[in-house]
Amino acid sequence: MIRFLKIFFGTVFTLLILIGSCVFYAFKIEPYRIASNQLYLNEKTSDFIKVVQFSDTHIKADFNYKNLDKVVNYINKQNPDVVVFTGDLYDNYAKYHDDEHIIKELQKINATYDKIAIWGNRDCGGGAARQYENIMQQSGFTVLKNEKIGR
């Protein structure tokens, strides 16, 4: 019986540590992580265009314009030709929004040719649906709605 209890409580303890670690990673590490990948489409030519894509900023009280500043600085260090934001600017616009500071931060993004934005699922609902396009346009982004640019 004692052996069973040791195994049982050892298993429960291990599961609690594992679950706690996953929750900690999901809320405290992953949201602040920046990943960078470089893809080469044609190695036979010296012509290239650098595109930086970012998304899912999910701005909220504990990830605000100060955190966005770090992302903007990282983007600008890449010297992009084109920047594409693929949606989900705010986490929940009805609960938290700081448009003035967010616009100022997004305006700092430098791109040689264009800054492009598309809508994410969190940009289409709630108060964000009425503000997203305006925020991105004031930030210097071309907002696409089921359309293309270029050829």
PLM regions and their residue ranges:
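Short solvent-exposed loop/turn micro-motifs enriched in small/polar/acidic residues
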Residues: Y32-I34, G140-L144
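A substrate-binding/cap region within the structured catalytic cores of diverse enzymes
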Residues: K145-I149
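N-terminal membrane-anchoring alpha-helices
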Residues: M1-T45
